[in-house]
Amino acid sequence: MHATDFGLTLIIANPAAQSGAAREVAGRLQRFMDMTARASQFDLVLTERMGHAKELAAQAQGYRTVIALGGDGVIHEVVNGLMTQDEAVRPALAILPVGSGNDFAQTLGIDDFSGKDFGALLSCELQRQDIGRIRSWNPASGSGEASVEYYDQTLSIGIDAAIGLGTTELRKKTGLAGTPLYTLSGLEQFGLRYRNYPMTVSFDGAPAERVQAIIMAIQLGPTYGSGYRICPEADPCDGMLDVCYACGPVPRAVALPMFLSAKDGHHTKLPPVRMRPCRHAELTFEEPDYPIQADGEPIVASRIEVDVLGGALHVWRPTH
């Protein structure tokens, strides 16, 4: 088995992840790296505030690898920081997921990390991973300029975004994680936020179409919501975005089973659901305050443009 050498490595860990358990995991990771010499040299930094992981990754010049230890939020920040670096010197990304969703980790084949077993780091290979770029316009900002955000797994608008964003407070109340958390959030948000979200959409420069979207997911990987296979055929290395959207009006009594059927990818042939690949998407929202999320992080916008950046990031994944 070929042993992985990450080279000069920066470990960015969110100590608050998994209700604070990630601090202990970071300590165990440090001892593992010392014992196994998987990196020629490594530095460990604990994040101190929101946005800190992005800053650290953006400043990680000279490193061959950046390891993100935490939930989807810290991984999303690290990806956004790395994407500010020039591609020629951009470090590779490795992840150790200690969060509630972990869809990007599942896409990479890391689906059983417990915080104690670092075997996923023993034998890894590099792959070039597509990254999504979102340009968003928020009239409330007053600048008229687009904000830029990158994502590694999922972008969604509508009830599915409301479900993802709703997990933050629900996790604090219930202590749930993974699929049970997202399923409970789905049941709650279907009562609070279920409606049509009218928008105008255009894919790859085609004429714009007005749709009454219930959900709109623009994926790099196949899953969101801790394993819901919303775009079962999505491949994060094919240079394409995979889109799933469902158009209303659809009664709640029909929409809820449709949503639950996405757990196993059985929704794709249902009448309200449309599936398509694209490289570029433009969406204009007819009303303010639509729920929008990218890798679980909120976006406020009246219009967005989405592009795929093919093979933009080197990512370490376990060798299977």
Positions of predicted regions on the chain:
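ATP/NTP phosphate-donor binding region
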Residues: 1-69, 76, 116
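ATP/nucleoside-binding phosphotransfer catalytic cores, i.e., glycine-rich phosphate-binding loops
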Residues: 203-210, 229-320
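Short glycine-rich anion-binding loops that position phosphate/pyrophosphate groups of nucleotides
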Residues: 16-17, 71-74, 98-101, 157, ...
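Short amphipathic alpha-helical segments
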Residues: 23-25, 79-82, 106-108, 229-230
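Glycine-rich phosphate/pyrophosphate-binding beta-alpha loops
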Residues: 156, 160, 217-231, 298
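Short Gly/Thr/Asp-enriched flexible loops that form oxyanion-binding sites at enzyme active sites
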Residues: 74-87
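Catalytic core of DAGKc-family lipid kinases
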Residues: 47, 84-214
